[in-house]
Amino acid sequence: REEKIPLFFAEEAAKRDWKHFGMIPEDTKYNQSHATIYEQDEAVGHSVRAVYMYTAMADLAATEHDEKLFDACERLWNNMTEKKMYITGGIGSTVEGEAFTKEYELPNDMAYAETCASIGLVFFAKQMLKMSKNGKYADAMERELYNGIISGMQLDGKRFFYVNPLEVNPGVSGEIFGYKHVIPERPGWYACACCPPNLVRMVTSLGRYAWDEDDDVIYSHLFIGQEARLKKADIKVVSEYPWKGHVSYSITPKTGDEFAVAIHIPGYLKSFEVTLNGMRLKENGETNADVIYSCLLYTSDAADEL
């Protein structure tokens, strides 16, 4: 046995004479146990299992300040979002094992793109933001929330999609072998009902994904209307996003300590402007797809309108 394989899984399988890792016996890629976490550089196997594990990896990297582990997370992130993700943010392109397949193999009409996988990608993105305030992670959260996740629930909250295809063909989707998982209409429930409660959990906990706060900076990741009670300030956000581009922040500092507010500017914007109490601070700012947080320094005890 090679020294670098994840020994726990191999040893337990030998003890139990049990070799089922997924759809195929000995398919260790199904549950991402084919290599150590430091050596993985391609998103493989069951997509939900994958992003949940990557979330734990990123959390551990941030907690332990483990740059090597963060580098592994970054490699997996880049492979998944640049080569294995639909334009909607959907991941996991095949029903076979609910899994990732080959790079750029993203069929519209046979897509799996499980709702739980998109939710898991938001979990992963939020943990990556702990280590690096790179705008691409917040961009991914936004893409999922407005596309890959919200499609999983009907507007009245009573019917759900487990699978989120980009193309549905009446008479083919849900009927013909290879397309039976692509259901044309949202069912009321599922025998394996992981997605509906997971989606509800996401919607009811959006606040934790919208903000981060460290010693001297408050980070706003998402343009979600809300009232946030943070350590340094109370912030009310009134948002017309995504229908209109206007978002206002009413910021009431709680202490006289100096702090900054850093607002994520989506990487796809061609331009933006920032005003403070009606005074223009930035006009026609250009965005960078990799890193863009517009920062404003606060020293006042008075409330401000941004």
Which residue stretches match the model-derived regions?
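Glycan-recognition and catalytic cores of secretory/periplasmic carbohydrate-active enzymes
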Residues: R1-L297
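Single conserved hydrophobic/aromatic residue that forms the stacking wall/gate
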Residues: Y298-L306
